[in-house]
Amino acid sequence: MDHFDQDTYHNLPVEIWKHIIDSDIDSTINLLFSCKQFIGLVCILTNNLNLLNLLVKKGNLKFLEFYFRLNTETNKLYTEQRLRVEQNECLKMSCIHGCLEILKYLISIGVDFRMNDDEPLMLAIENGHLKIVQFLYSKRVNIRARNNRPLVLSCEKGYINIVNFLLDKKASFVSKQNEVFSTACGFGQMDIVKLLVEKGADINVGKIPPIRAAAAGGHLNVIEHLVNKGASINKCSVDSLFSAAFYGHLNIVKYLLGYISEVNIIYYAFEKACINGHIDIVQYLFSENIITKDIITENSNTRYLFYHTIRNKHKHIIKFLIENNIFDKDKKYPDILESAPKDMDPYDYLISFLNYQ
């Protein structure tokens, strides 16, 4: 390179240049490959994986080849084991970033594209790279690896193009646990839900039934679609209500209350909302008189509700309940609030007082 780059290199000690490049490889990568002096720093960088990741991400195959050749030929500390580790990582990075040319190159020099039970395939699916998935399939990877994980993962991420490809290649969504379909429902991937329903997916059964999965994920549109398609909501309405309350999905709680009237069941949903800090559900159930002061105080499990809500430090829930004169009758909450130091929020004091008893 020109004298400017060489002079620039000699203006600072090698240790300083190493620190500069290590601290921000994204901004300094072009400097690293500007002249032979800077290129020599490649062998002493602290985290070479950052550099390799950037080269793969940019699709810089020539620089990648040069990196391996430079280290192999000039770096006495560069062992065969380190070479294999870095090449394996580069192959995984090529699947993450969708760099087909680099993937092909690494496979051509013998890097194992089926490492760790087809991890490269999983990484390509997780990041939505259909071309990588198609190429790996042509290399005879197992598209049913890890108990059908490729299809489950593509449903989770919502990549319908990959789902279609896997189905075309005879991956099956049918299983006793119905994991593929329930996953699509749980992550709200409506296009995939519709596709699988059209192909005959069971809309009722599963280790986690589809409606319950959708309730836990907060996807009312999926629940409504399944019900419209004939799903039996009554069979899983209770567990679905509990899941919606646990995860804080008020719109689904409202919807499911249209199918549930038992006070004890609704109380336990209220309890889950309290313990997990979902004030909007708590206030809604209370304001609509679905849950009342009498229902709470007369329930034999009130102590459990307060204990865990306080342990989880949900001050806004505790404050709401006490301001409505609702509390575990065995605890003198008003007295504790009154005894709070003047420089401390009374409810913070209550929580700290009860948590350290």
Swiss-Prot record:
ANK repeats lie at residues 34-63, 86-115, 116-145, 147-175, 176-205, 206-235, 237-265, 267-294, 301-331. Pfam families: Ank_2. SUPFAM superfamilies: Ankyrin repeat (SSF48403). InterPro entries: Ankyrin_rpt, Ankyrin_rpt-contain_sf. Keywords: ANK repeat, Repeat. PROSITE patterns: ANK_REP_REGION, ANK_REPEAT. PANTHER family: REPEAT PROTEIN, PUTATIVE-RELATED, SURFACE ANTIGEN BSPA-LIKE-RELATED. This is Putative ankyrin repeat protein L42. It comes from Acanthamoeba polyphaga mimivirus (APMV).
